């Protein structure tokens, strides 16, 4: 992305940001906590699989989180379904009380490992100093999101927080983006959205007629995906500092 203000963002008056893996390193915390919890609940499971259990839990190959964002299950039911699928992958039974025990081990490990990305506070502070309202839009639950923001110190740096359960629909449904804009007090065309997921964040925002940025922290994106976003006029961002730079924030 070029340095300095972006002409494509000249009309932007507010910013909406995804939370997980955009502001907060949720991936690393889930990997660590999922492995800890699986080792506690299923100590007889293959150790090589236990070591990968957190990664498997987060990857959610059965799509339970997607079903939750579409309103097909509750947040709690979604998480318990993912635990059940993880037990099957580990070759273990999900007995009575196992899901609760897994969560009881997972939550403290997750909270201990949770960190904000180092650029998050800097970028948010620069946006605020420049008078740009900021909102967070996430497909996670309200209580869980509030706890994550409190633990990482980001809760006081936002004007509006919109979650899947408080909105009644999730990304990439255009209604989620439009309602978040309404709560910020800006039109979609003048509200920049930035997130790390290609479909639910970058392309979802573009489909909602918003300027968007695709955050790719871990290297260059897949060439085919890069072509897709380039064709939609969506810049690829390496960090959140580029959001503040692109909006001309000192």
Language-model segments: residues:
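Asp-based, Mg2+/Mn2+-dependent phosphohydrolase catalytic module
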Residues: 1-15, 27-28, 97, 121, ...
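N-terminal helical cap/lid subdomain that shapes the substrate entry/recognition surface
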Residues: 2-118
């Amino acid at each position: 992305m070029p340095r300095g203000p972006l002409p494509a963002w000249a009309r932007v008056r507010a910013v909406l940001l995804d939370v997980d893996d955009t502001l907060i390193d949720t991936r690393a915390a889930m990997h660590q906590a999922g492995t800890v919890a699986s080792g506690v609940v299923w100590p007889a499971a293959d150790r090589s699989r236990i070591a990968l259990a957190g990664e498997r839990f987060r990857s959610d190959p059965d799509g339970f989180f997607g079903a939750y964002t579409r309103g097909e299950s509750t947040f709690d039911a979604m998480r318990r379904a993912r635990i059940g699928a993880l037990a099957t992958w580990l070759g273990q039974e999900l007995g009575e009380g196992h899901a609760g025990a897994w969560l009881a081990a997972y939550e403290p490990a997750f909270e201990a490992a949770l960190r904000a990305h180092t650029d998050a506070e800097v970028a948010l502070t620069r946006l605020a100093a420049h008078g740009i309202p900021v909102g967070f839009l996430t497909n996670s639950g309200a209580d869980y999101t509030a706890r994550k923001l409190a633990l990482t110190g980001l809760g006081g740096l936002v004007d509006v927080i919109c979650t899947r359960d408080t909105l009644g629909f999730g990304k990439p449904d255009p209604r989620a983006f439009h309602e978040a804009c309404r709560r910020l007090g800006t039109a979609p065309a003048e509200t920049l959205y930035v997130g790390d997921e290609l479909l639910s964040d970058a392309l979802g925002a573009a489909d909602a007629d918003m300027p968007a940025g695709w955050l790719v922290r871990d290297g260059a994106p897949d060439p085919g995906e890069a072509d897709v976003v380039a064709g939609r006029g969506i810049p690829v961002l390496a960090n959140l500092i580029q959001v503040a730079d692109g909006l001309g924030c000192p």
